[in-house]
């Protein structure tokens, strides 16, 4: 069984993932990391990954950009693979993700849903067909006024898919 640490365990996605994992017989969450400890979980929760003494095979991260630097440092130090799903990272943090990926396995995705990943592929194909014919491609998104990262990580990933198909011609 895969033993995972849920980084950002008390956030919305952390709680969703924790609930899904309870129903799975291939993976278990053995510890959680979150600054907010006011939610009861079926595993021990630590306020930082550095203080977590529970052995695990991987860290699943749905936290926030402010927590990513320490996360990467500790994962590299402990040679602990990480699934990085936090969005809103700075250019410096993205460079740090790339650097960490040279030392430990890092899977980074702005959106893990099958539908969004299919949409990214479809957008690449559409961009290859439409742009040479003179079409402009634009992404417009709407969110509630409490949205933490705008544009969203998903919108940036969609734009990156289009831009990749267009040999990085577009600026956003």
Model segments located where?
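Active-site-lining helix/loop region of Rossmann-like oxidoreductase modules
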Residues: 2-20, 46, 127-172
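NAD(P)-binding Rossmann-fold cofactor-contacting core
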Residues: 23-42
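Hydrophobic beta-strand scaffold residues
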Residues: 29, 45, 82-83, 106-108
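Short, ordered loop/turn segments at secondary-structure junctions
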Residues: 34-35, 87-89, 111-112, 142-144
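Short amphipathic alpha-helix with an adjacent loop that forms part of the alpha/beta core around
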Residues: 46-55
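N-terminal Rossmann-like NAD(P) cofactor-binding module of classical short-chain dehydrogenase/reductase
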Residues: 59-60
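Short glycine-/small-residue-rich Rossmann-like dinucleotide-binding loops
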Residues: 63-64, 87
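Rossmann-fold NAD(P)-binding glycine/threonine-rich loop
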Residues: 72-73, 77, 86-108, 117-119, ...
């Amino acid at each position: 069984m895969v033993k995972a640490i849920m980084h950002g365990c008390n956030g919305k996605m952390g709680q969703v993932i924790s609930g899904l994992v309870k129903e799975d017989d291939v993976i278990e969450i053995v510890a959680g990391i979150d600054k907010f400890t006011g939610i009861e979980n079926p595993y021990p929760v630590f306020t930082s990954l550095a203080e977590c003494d529970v052995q695990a095979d991987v860290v699943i991260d749905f936290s926030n950009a402010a927590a990513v630097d320490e996360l990467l440092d500790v994962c590299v130090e402990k040679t602990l693979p990480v699934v990085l799903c936090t969005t809103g990272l700075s250019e410096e943090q993205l460079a740090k993700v790339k650097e960490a990926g040279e030392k430990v396995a890092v899977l980074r995705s702005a959106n893990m849903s099958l539908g969004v990943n299919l949409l990214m592929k479809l957008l690449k194909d559409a961009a290859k067909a439409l742009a040479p014919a003179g079409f402009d491609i634009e992404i417009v998104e709407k969110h509630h006024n409490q949205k933490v990262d705008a544009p969203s990580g998903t919108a940036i990933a969609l734009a990156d898919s289009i831009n990749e198909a267009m040999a990085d011609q577009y600026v956003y």
